[in-house]
């Protein structure tokens, strides 16, 4: 019985919701704002060299499309990611190579109705 209880707790921990970092990473690598927007909350804070504010999902998608048009991505790699102590939020830090420049990307995810959605994205030139 103790083994069953341990296995159940282990399975519950393993199946806890996680942000889809593979899909987010692939969308950033391709510069695909539409694919990335699937993981946006209804409002998202976007910070780049030219914008800084809270935007609707549609506005944020448009702003990122403009960014990816002027700075065509050629690759993205995650350098760090993890969960907050409360397990209700996650972060991801990565490097985007785009338009001949290197950018540091910070993404903050928050759990909303059982799914992790992007609440904040910062794109800063390295």
Task: State the predicted function of each range.
Residues 39-41, 73, 89, 102-104, ...:
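Extracytoplasmic
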Residues 17-32:
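Short, aromatic-enriched amphipathic alpha-helices that serve as compact interaction elements
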Residues 32-43:
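Short, well-ordered alpha-helical segments enriched in acidic and aromatic residues
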Residues 46-53:
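A short gly/proline-enriched turn/hairpin at secondary-structure junctions
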Residues 62-101:
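Surface-exposed, charged secondary-structure patches
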Residues 1-20:
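Bacterial Sec-dependent N-terminal signal peptides
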Residues 29, 53-57:
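Solvent-exposed, acidic/flexible segments
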Residues 102-126:
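Short beta-strand edge/turn micro-motifs at domain boundaries
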């Amino acid at each position: 019985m103790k083994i069953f209880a341990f296995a159940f707790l282990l399975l519950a921990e393993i199946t806890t919701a996680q942000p889809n970092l593979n899909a987010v990473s692939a969308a950033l690598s391709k510069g695909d704002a539409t694919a990335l927007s699937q993981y946006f909350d209804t409002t998202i804070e976007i910070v780049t060299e030219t914008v800084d504010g809270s935007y609707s999902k549609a506005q944020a998608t448009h702003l990122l499309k403009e960014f990816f048009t002027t700075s065509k991505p050629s690759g993205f790699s995650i350098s760090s990611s993890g969960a907050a102590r409360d397990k209700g939020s996650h972060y991801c830090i990565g490097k985007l190579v785009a338009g001949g420049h290197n950018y540091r990307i910070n993404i903050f995810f928050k759990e909303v109705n059982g799914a992790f959605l992007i609440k904040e994205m910062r794109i800063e030139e390295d």
